[in-house]
Regions:
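Conserved active-site helix of classical SDR/Rossmann-fold NAD(P)-dependent CH-OH oxidoreductases
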Residues: 72, 103-111, 206
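NAD(P)-dependent short-chain dehydrogenase/reductase
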Residues: 99, 108-190
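A short beta-strand-loop structural module common to alpha/beta enzyme folds
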Residues: 25-35
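Short-chain dehydrogenase/reductase
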Residues: 10, 61-65, 95-106, 131, ...
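C-terminal substrate-binding subdomain of Rossmann-fold SDR/epimerase-dehydratase oxidoreductases
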Residues: 154-266
Length: 266
């Protein structure tokens, strides 16, 4: 099978690339060479949305519009039997520049690639994703804070930038240990009563790769997706059970202990 993969260096795209059967003929693309995809025909085109650029786009730190226009033009013209888009549910509910641009991608796929599968996932987690609820719980990090936290600790202004049209700020560089210790645990950032649909990126990528020749339309969860209240996720970190998320927490904590032990030996 001839497969084109756009966004192969991102947290989801990298996992998809690693899982693609070597029997497939794989072509990889990024924003620098995106339009060269039009030189060939494919069995399947996979596009993994670059969520790592979200904050920079909303703060106008990068000009994403030209890249997006090229992406949409490619979607309109590329010759493929199936088109797979991997994106986030947040683009449907958040009102910011990044969501507006990604919605344009979603609409272009729906209009010009009728044989499509569109994954709009909620809360993703995995080894290569260094942000979000699960990452913060596991690493005691604060990748997102509320405005009032900045009032209390003004020294944080160097580490955070505002998220457009919200009362939240997103981390742009790692916090020094002394600041991290001041902040303590992230209990107040992620609502206890909110429902989070969590999906391990490996299983999402496996689902994509296992269904390369199928057109399934809009997908908001897969078989391995688990739903929890925010309070349940925080509890699972301390009290293990048989869920996929709990196993991920346990494995990650074991890896952390091993790295710490090796570091102490050195």
């Amino acid at each position: 099978m001839k497969v084109a993969l756009i966004g192969y260096t991102g947290s989801v795209g990298k996992e998809i690339f690693d899982l693609l059967d070597k029997k497939n003929k794989i072509y990889t693309f990024n924003r620098a060479n995106i339009l060269t995809i039009l030189n060939e025909e494919y069995d399947t085109v996979i596009c993994s949305a670059p969520t790592s650029q979200k904050l920079k786009v909303n703060l106008d730190l990068i000009d994403y519009e030209d890249d997006l226009n090229n992406l949409c033009e490619m979607i309109k013209q590329v010759k493929t039997k199936n088109f797979i888009l991997v994106s986030s549910q947040s683009i449907l509910f958040e009102k910011n520049k990044y969501s507006d641009l990604q919605n344009k991608v979603l609409k272009t796929v729906s209009e010009f690639q009728p044989n499509n599968t569109i994954y709009l996932m909620d809360t993703l987690y995995g080894e290569n994703l260094k942000k979000g609820f699960i990452y913060d719980v596991l690493n005691k990090e604060w990748t997102i804070i509320k405005k009032e936290v900045l009032y209390k600790y003004p020294e944080l202004n160097n580490c955070y930038k505002p998220i457009e049209n919200s009362d939240f700020y997103q981390q742009i560089k790692s916090l020094p240990d002394d600041l991290l210790n001041k902040l303590g645990y992230i209990e107040n950032i992620y609502p206890n009563d909110k429902i989070f649909q969590t999906t391990y990126i490996y299983y999402l990528a496996l689902n994509v790769v296992s269904n390369l020749d199928k057109s399934s339309g809009l997908i908001s969860k897969i078989k391995e997706t688990e739903s929890f209240k925010g309070s349940e996720i925080k509890n699972i970190y301390y009290n293990s059970n048989n869920t996929i998320l709990s196993k991920y927490f346990s494995n990650s904590k074991q890896k952390f202990k091993k790295r710490s032990h090796e570091k102490n030996i050195l």
